[in-house]
């Protein structure tokens, strides 16, 4: 028989760096989840992605056990890495902070395709381009056909 799902928690944690301090500790402790066990499992599973911010969805059950799914890094963070910037523009419609190529957009879209709600790479590229535009990152050239 399947376990009864009590709820879900969504967090963004740096890979290989989960510890009981906020935001992890209070979020899990309030639900009665073993914080140290989660931290050990998360750090073991994400040691190859150390330092990258990773979204994680924790499903906890009525018996206080849990499962979690680690997703790919957010598009905004991947765009900042690709453009070698620390943050986006405060005024994205007026001031552009960086410029990237459609090839970089395609690479990010291919990486993120499993987490996006689209099925083809062109739609994913348009989503990534929209995020870039809202961050003040310009894209060189025209959309590839």
UniProtKB/Swiss-Prot annotation:
Keywords annotated in UniProt: Methylation, Ribonucleoprotein, Ribosomal protein, RNA-binding, rRNA-binding
Gene Ontology terms describing biological process: translation
Molecular function in Gene Ontology: large ribosomal subunit rRNA binding; structural constituent of ribosome
Domain of life, per lineage: Bacteria
GO cellular component: cytosolic large ribosomal subunit
Record flagged with keyword RNA-binding: yes
Post-translational modification, as annotated: One or more lysine residues are methylated.
Bilayer-spanning residue ranges: none
Subunit structure and binding partners: Part of the ribosomal stalk of the 50S ribosomal subunit. Interacts with L10 and the large rRNA to form the base of the stalk. L10 forms an elongated spine to which L12 dimers bind in a sequential fashion forming a multimeric L10(L12)X complex.
Function comment: Forms part of the ribosomal stalk which helps the ribosome interact with GTP-bound translation factors.
Stored PANTHER family: 60S RIBOSOMAL PROTEIN L12, LARGE RIBOSOMAL SUBUNIT PROTEIN UL11M
The name this protein goes by in its record: Large ribosomal subunit protein uL11
UniProt source species: Porphyromonas gingivalis (strain ATCC BAA-308 / W83)
Gene that encodes the chain: rplK
């Amino acid at each position: 028989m399947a376990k009864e799902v009590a709820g879900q928690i969504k967090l963004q944690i740096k890979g290989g760096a989960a510890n009981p301090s906020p935001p992890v500790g209070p979020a899990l402790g309030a639900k009665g989840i073993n914080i140290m066990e989660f931290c050990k499992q998360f750090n073991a599973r994400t040691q190859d992605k150390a330092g990258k911010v990773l979204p994680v969805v924790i499903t906890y059950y009525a018996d206080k056990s849990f499962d979690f799914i680690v997703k790919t890094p957010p598009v905004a963070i991947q765009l900042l890495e690709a453009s070698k910037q620390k943050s986006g523009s405060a005024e994205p419609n007026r001031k552009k902070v960086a410029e990237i190529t459609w090839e970089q957009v395609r690479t990010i879209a291919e990486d993120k395709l499993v987490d996006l709600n689209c099925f083809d790479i062109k739609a994913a590229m348009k989503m990534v381009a929209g995020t870039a535009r809202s961050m003040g990152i310009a894209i060189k050239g025209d959309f590839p056909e």
